[in-house]
C-alpha cells in the first residue's frame, strides 16, 4: 500500500530550478531516506512534501488524496507527522507536561491522556526524566521526546528532518532503535532526510539520492553503495559500506 506519492515535483527560485521533476513513493511500514549534497534540492523536496514550501509543479498524494495545496496542520490531521530539525519542545515544561500539552488537543479524558503519556514515556525510556525540565535534556533525550510528541496524533507517516543532528553516537543508536520499532512494532512509515548518510542508510529500506535537483538514483542501501555514479557524485570512493554486505 502506497501512503505517500510525490509526482514530478518542481520548484524554482528566480530563474533557477532547484527541484526538477522529482518523483518518489513511501509505502506502508517503509523507512525511506532522502539524501543528497548541500544545495542538491533534497531539503526543498522534503519541505514540499510536508507542506512548508508550495511546489511550482507536480503533486503530492497522501492515502490517494491530493494534498499538494494543503497547509501543514491539515496534513497533520490526515495522519502525517513531522519532526523538525529545530528544537520543538516547550523548554520550561517537564517531559511529562510536554506530552500532556499536546494530548490536550485530542478528544480524550484526563485519565486517558495520562495513560497515553505514561505509555509514551515507557516506550521511549523517558520515565526517569518525567519531572525533568526539557531545557536540561541531552540532545538524544530531547529527540526522543520530540518523536514521542509526534506520535500523540497517531500518524501513519512520520517525516524526520535531521533526526541525528547534534546527537552523540550512543544516542544515535538509541534513535535508530526507536525508528526500527516505529516501523516494526507500530507499523509506521517514515521519511528521513539527514546529513549523516551512514546512520540514515542503516535504518532505511530504500533511499533516494538527489543531485542537481533530480533523482540521481534510488534503491536499497546496498545497491546505492555499489552504484559507481552515486559514489562519484555523492558518497565518495572511500565510503565504507561493509555492514550492508
Residue spans of the language-model regions?
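The feature captures the beta-strand-to-loop junction immediately N-terminal to the Walker
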Residues: 35-37
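Conserved ABC ATPase "signature" region
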Residues: 100, 111-129, 177-180
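Helix-to-loop junction immediately C-terminal to a conserved catalytic motif
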Residues: 50
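Conserved ABC ATPase signature
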Residues: 133-137, 141
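Conserved catalytic motifs of ABC-family nucleotide-binding domains
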Residues: 154
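Conserved ABC transporter NBD signature motif
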Residues: 58-65, 78, 116
Amino acid at each position: 500500500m502506497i501512503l505517500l506519492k510525490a509526482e514530478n515535483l518542481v520548484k524554482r527560485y528566480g530563474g533557477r530550478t532547484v527541484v526538477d521533476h522529482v518523483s518518489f513513493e513511501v509505502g506502508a511500514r517503509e523507512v525511506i531516506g532522502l539524501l543528497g549534497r548541500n544545495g542538491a534540492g533534497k531539503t526543498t523536496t522534503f519541505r514540499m512534501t510536508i507542506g512548508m514550501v508550495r511546489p511550482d509543479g507536480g503533486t503530492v498524494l497522501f492515502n490517494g488524496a491530493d494534498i499538494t495545496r494543503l497547509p501543514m496542520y491539515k496534513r497533520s490531521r490526515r495522519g502525517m507527522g513531522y519532526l523538525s530539525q529545530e528544537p520543538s519542545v516547550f523548554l520550561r515544561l517537564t517531559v511529562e507536561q510536554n506530552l500532556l500539552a499536546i494530548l490536550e488537543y485530542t478528544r480524550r479524558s484526563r485519565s486517558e491522556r495520562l495513560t497515553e503519556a505514561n505509555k509514551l514515556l515507557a516506550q521511549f525510556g523517558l520515565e526517569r526524566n518525567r519531572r525533568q525540565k526539557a531545557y536540561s535534556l541531552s540532545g538524544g533525550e530531547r529527540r526522543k521526546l520530540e518523536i514521542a510528541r509526534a506520535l500523540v496524533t497517531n500518524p501513519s507517516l512520520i517525516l524526520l528532518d535531521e533526526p541525528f543532528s547534534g546527537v552523540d553516537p550512543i544516542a544515535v543508536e538509541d534513535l535508530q532503535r526507536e525508528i526500527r520499532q516505529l516501523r516494526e512494532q507500530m507499523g509506521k512509515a517514515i521519511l528521513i532526510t539527514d546529513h549523516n548518510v551512514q546512520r540514515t542508510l542503516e535504518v532505511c529500506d530504500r533511499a533516494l539520492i538527489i543531485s542537481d535537483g533530480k533523482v540521481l538514483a534510488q534503491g536499497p542501501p546496498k545497491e546505492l553503495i555499489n552504484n559507481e555514479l552515486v559514489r562519484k557524485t555523492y558518497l565518495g570512493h572511500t565510503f565504507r559500506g561493509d555492514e550492508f554486505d
